[in-house]
Amino acid sequence: MIGQEKLFERLVTSRLPKSNLFIGEEGCGKHSFVKEICDRHKLDYVDITDDISKELVDELYISSNICAYVIDIVALSKKSRYINKENAILKLVEEPPQSSVIFILAEYESQVIDTIKNRCVIWKFESYTHDYLKEIKYYSDDRIYTLLNTPGKVIKGVDEEYYQQLFGVCESIINNVYKANVSNTLSLEKYMNFNNEAGYSLDLFFRCMKFMLYQKFLEDTTHIDAFDLTTQFVEKSHVLNVNEKYLFDNYLLELKGIYDKS
């Protein structure tokens, strides 16, 4: 498994824990990785994301199959069912069926409640190098690989101009948000994909803002508060089913407040 050799080697050469939580961003290959682990351990890969329920868990306890049961938290949340399924998942990781292994998949630890997380061995995917990502798709501007930081994101990536425009939008916000009124600030929603599929995702926007503010902070420490604020909002954006429009608007208003004072 290119880019995850150390983690892969550790998992295929030792006994698998009964309950596992894999943390890796979109496009890092969690499903393919787990399938390969299952093949090496001669376990049937069974994705129960769509079917997880108390009734299913009860059925698994009387099954004699030797399986790896997989639950994708992000996929489950997109159907607004994660909260209703937490108790079933908790029961499964607390007492996994005999001869079976549980794999919970998520993008960030914050997406998994503590009672589930605390009962799993947590495995984190390593970051991919820019050199490796360049082999998948070449961009002349290395900054783009900070935004598209997994193979899957790079494969889905569009033309370079799209990202150059995003850098320009973020630069303009940083330089001008202090003199914008509330109406001007909220008008920036037009760049996002809340109502426009061609717009930028909230994750991509925050990733870009954090990167650019960090670069500015290295040259001018007055940007530290803006960088810290952005880091906080990056974490908030990882919450499942968050109201992205509300989060985006609040971020810009708080950012304006920081630069108003400086």
Indicate where each model-derived feature is located.
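Conserved alpha-helical scaffold flanking the Walker A/P-loop in AAA+ ATPase domains
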Residues: E9-T13, D51-V93
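Structural motif
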Residues: I71-D72, F103-L105
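Short beta->alpha connector loops
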Residues: T49-S53, A106-E109
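Conserved catalytic segments around the Walker B and adjacent sensor/switch elements
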Residues: H41-D50
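Charged, glycine-rich active-site and insertion segments that engage polyanionic ligands
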Residues: M1-K42, Q98-V101, E107-S262
